[in-house]
């Protein structure tokens, strides 16, 4: 993919496997965030949740992966997200990335995208945007 071939409106969508408690624990280990509400149902219930839930940054990481896979790992110049809803065991998340603009800045060809992560019911857990630098 090059700057000349990417067009405003181009889109990538990726569906991820259903979330599991094991994924939450693995993410805790990778991130160092061992807040027990992400892996202990008793603690999650004590703070008003029906069960454990995924880290917001786990959802963000899935979105970043779609951007990285499309444009390349060195291409990401900016990534900004807003966490909207929690994700739960069994949720099937879909990330959609849509090109919203192209521009040249500081000698780089930049592509702006909007991104969303939503569950199987269409409920958004993450919304944001990113900028990637691409070759001519």
What are these regions (language model features)?
Residues 1-75:
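Hot-dog-fold acyl-thioester-processing enzymes
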Residues 69-95:
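Mid-chain, well-packed structural core segment of small domains
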